[in-house]
Amino acid sequence: MDSDRIVFKVHNQLVSLKPEVISDQYEYKYPAIDDKKKPSITLGKAPDLKTAYKSILSGMNAAKLDPDDVCSYLAAAMVFFEGICPEDWTSYGINIAKKGDKITPAVLVDIQRTNTEGNWAQAGGQDLTRDPTTPEHASLVGLLLCLYRLSKIVGQNTGNYKTNVAERMEQIFETAPFVKIVEHHTLMTTHKMCANWSTIPNFRFLAGVYDMFFSRIEHLYSAIRVGTVVTAYEDCSGLVSFTTFIRQINLTARDAVLYFFHKNFEEEIKRMFEPGQETAVPHSYFIHFRSLGLSGKSPYSSNAVGHTFNLIHFVGCYMGQVRSLNATVIQSCAPHEMSVLGGYLGEEFFGRGTFERRFFRDEKELQDYEAAEATKIDLALEDDGTVNSDDEDFFSGETRSPEAVYSRIMMSGGRLKKSHIKRYISVSSNHQARPNSFAEFLNKTYASDTR
């Protein structure tokens, strides 16, 4: 009999069937570039920069911008940001630049142009008869790219936060080396007319190009990154959370994964560490793969590795981390089971550390310390006859080895202990819970637990 089938009767008739549910029809696409071709973008005819500046500035003052014109201008304005490449720059086998080369953001990608003219409305810009200066172009580019960051701020009760961010960014682009080109609050007013621009592929692409450039090249106008920094590791919340997690608990990625006691982690860990990706290469195209269009469905997002994401943030909640308490639970990825494992791992790594002397007054003191430690190790390895030495890690209350933690979970029947629940309630009840957050989940799940 097929193990996936079930048997039952309907009106005395024997029925045998295989229950099937809706599965994820999307295929995760890895960002590795196989053909050694730079990411490309197609835009309209390159504009006259003076005309484009006047038109875009006029549109910003009127809170009415054409996204195609904005993208065409942003690509053309890259000529103002020439910098020196500090080292040979290679990614996925593509030679981007050599050390000492003078480069602009355009060197990172292939920008193709058609003969299609832009709209370039002149209304409202007649007062500017001279050519705009480089600081004026830099200020306009910076303000336009700030629209990307503002459009990425979503969620409830973000009104004041978004306004404050917009005001701070405006202040950056009205002080040296930039110059003031718009009135106060213009950025926020314009954003309201462009609230979804982060979903426009060409605009997102150009924001990623500028960010990748300024993240490596020291430049007078590097503050432009204030609007584009959100393109770095975009749709990588799962991988970023895992990286933050292993640093917090002071383990290597290999050692941390040994504590992931659940079969649903297998596919996610395989997905996160797919060979051939440049996840650990500085200044790689990987960092901006989402904005550069290298992956339609990220294999590194919180939804792609939901069990891992849930576990990491339950551990974070146990440790009282606000970021974890505010994060959104992936409801389809066993949050109840992950909260149990998170409690045990939180207990192991919260309020405890592994310490040893590393600095000494002189070489003799160092040698004496090493000799004393060696003696302690020899004594510890001696079998006292009460417990099989191979099993000591399983039963010792002082060890935090994966085997010991797993044994404690099994001895408790895979259930949280009273102390775990008390800790979860303590951290979540003192936090203003956002809808669907980990804090809300813990409050609803364990607040009424009578254990």
From Swiss-Prot:
Where in or outside the cell is it found?
Virion; Host cytoplasm
Q: Which UniProt keywords apply?
A: Capsid protein, Helical capsid protein, Host cytoplasm, Phosphoprotein, Ribonucleoprotein, RNA-binding, Superantigen, Viral nucleoprotein, Virion
- Give any Pfam family that matches: Rhabdo_ncap
- The residues the entry assigns to the signal sequence are none
Q: Which InterPro entries match?
A: Rhabdo_ncapsid, Rhabdovirus_ncapsid_C, Rhabdovirus_ncapsid_N, Rhabdovirus_nucleoprotein-like
| Listed Gene3D superfamilies | Nucleoprotein, Rhabdovirus nucleocapsid protein like domain
Q: Which GO terms describe its cellular component?
A: helical viral capsid; host cell cytoplasm; ribonucleoprotein complex; viral nucleocapsid
**What GO annotations for molecular function exist for this entry?**
RNA binding
State if Phosphoprotein is listed as a keyword: yes
Q: Where does it primarily localize? A: virion
Q: How is this chain modified after translation?
A: Phosphorylated by host CK2. Unphosphorylated protein N seems to have a better affinity for leader viral promoter encapsidation. Phosphorylation of protein N in ribonucleocapsid may stabilize the interaction with protein P, thereby playing an important role in viral transcription/replication.
Q: Which cysteines are joined by disulfide bonds?
A: none
Q: Which residues carry this modification: Phosphoserine?
A: 389
Q: What is the recorded function of this protein according to its Swiss-Prot or TrEMBL entry?
A: Encapsidates the genome in a ratio of one protein N per nine ribonucleotides, protecting it from nucleases. If expressed without protein P it binds non-specifically RNA and therefore can bind it's own mRNA. Interaction with protein P abolishes any non-specific RNA binding, and prevents phosphorylation. The soluble N-P complex encapsidates specifically the genomic RNA, with protein N protecting the genome like a pearl necklace. The encapsidated genomic RNA is termed the nucleocapsid (NC) and serves as template for viral transcription and replication.
How this chain assembles, per its entry, is:
Homomultimerizes to form the nucleocapsid. Binds to viral genomic RNA. In nucleocapsid, binds protein P and thereby positions the polymerase on the template. Protein P acts as a chaperone on free protein N to prevent it from aggregation before encapsidating genomic RNA.
Give the protein family. Belongs to the lyssavirus nucleocapsid protein family.
Recite the other comments: Displays a superantigen activity in human and mouse, activating mostly V-beta-8 subtypes of T-cell receptor.
Name of this chain's protein? Nucleoprotein
